[in-house]
């Protein structure tokens, strides 16, 4: 059963620092004030200290104890510039250019993670997804063995037993048309992410076909990806290609694929493309009354996550806990 309590317990045992790139935003300040009232997560706010203090005072949020770092007055800027130039040497970035780039809070905040000053980063309250993800790709980079960054949504709703029903859905936000091999990578990363939220992953590669009932290139892609994933992750329960009803409904599963250990019980869903994934998680959210947490970015060397520009302070607070717990 998933609850934020278990993530908070993880953080209490090993408190983390998280960077907020939009330190003056009232939603960020409200979330930071809530985090400061606890002892398991330490916020770092990027921006002008005077402007941040004024915004907090105007909004009535107590941010006493927050660490505020101003890119314009950072005592380790020379070190940051040198590292940035090394990371971007293939692009021929000069120190002067680096200083200009690092005046942007999204790049500056990402470098704080790269330098080990913070453990994770949460941005996107005012930045676009691209402006949050691009610095992460350039500076944090993907994990060894990974070729892409992908995303996962965690969906939660109370069940009839009183426990939470928890599902993982990928990739609903980043990769438009993932290849077979990219789908395999997405499945592995999503399964690992699911475990953090108390899910014992049973992975379904979704399609309009179940084990050969339909034909077409899209069917072949999901079937082949599922086969490759089974070979790569032999201890991970995987089925595919499979229709959604066969993946989640035991009665349908008994008819369509009675020998499958995943069919009827899947909880980690791999969509064929971003169209299906984005539509799918929003249907679950709006018609299925699931709370949706994400997108959680997967495949990076450190947790960097992106907020919706329409987020509220509660969503910032929740995503901060999720992001830090992944560190």
Tell me what each language-model feature is:
Residues 1-263, 268-327:
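Anion-binding alpha/beta catalytic cores of soluble intermediary-metabolism enzymes, centered on
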């Amino acid at each position: 059963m998933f609850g934020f309590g278990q993530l908070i317990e993880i953080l209490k045992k090993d408190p983390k620092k998280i960077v907020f790139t939009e330190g003056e935003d009232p939603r960020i300040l409200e979330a930071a004030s809530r985090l400061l009232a606890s002892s398991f997560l330490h916020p770092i706010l990027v921006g002008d200290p005077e402007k941040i203090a004024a915004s907090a005072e105007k909004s009535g949020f107590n941010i006493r104890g927050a660490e505020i770092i101003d890119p314009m007055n950072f005592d380790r800027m020379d070190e940051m510039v040198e590292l940035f130039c090394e990371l971007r040497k293939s692009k021929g970035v000069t120190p002067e250019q680096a200083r200009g780039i690092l005046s942007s809070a999204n790049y500056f905040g990402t470098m704080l993670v790269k330098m080990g000053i913070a453990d994770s980063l949460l941005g996107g309250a005012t930045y676009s997804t691209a402006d949050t993800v691009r610095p992460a790709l350039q500076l944090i980079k993907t994990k060894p063995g990974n070729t892409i960054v992908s995303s996962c949504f965690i969906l939660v709703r109370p069940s009839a037993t009183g426990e939470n029903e928890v599902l993982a859905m990928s990739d609903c936000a980043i990769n438009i048309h993932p290849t077979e091999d990219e789908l395999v990578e997405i499945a592995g990363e999503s399964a690992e992410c699911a475990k953090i939220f108390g899910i014992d992953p049973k992975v379904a590669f979704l399609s309009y076909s179940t084990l050969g009932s339909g034909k077409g290139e899209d069917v072949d892609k999901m079937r082949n990806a599922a086969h490759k994933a089974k070979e790569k992750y032999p201890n991970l329960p995987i089925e595919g290609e499979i229709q959604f009803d066969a993946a989640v409904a035991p009665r349908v599963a008994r008819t369509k694929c009675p020998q499958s250990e995943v069919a009827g019980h899947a909880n980690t869903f791999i969509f064929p493309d971003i169209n299906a994934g984005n539509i799918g998680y929003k249907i679950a959210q709006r018609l299925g009354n699931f709370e949706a947490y994400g997108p959680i970015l997967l495949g990076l060397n450190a947790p960097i996550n992106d907020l919706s520009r329409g987020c509220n302070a509660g969503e910032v607070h929740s995503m901060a806990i999720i992001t830090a717990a992944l560190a």
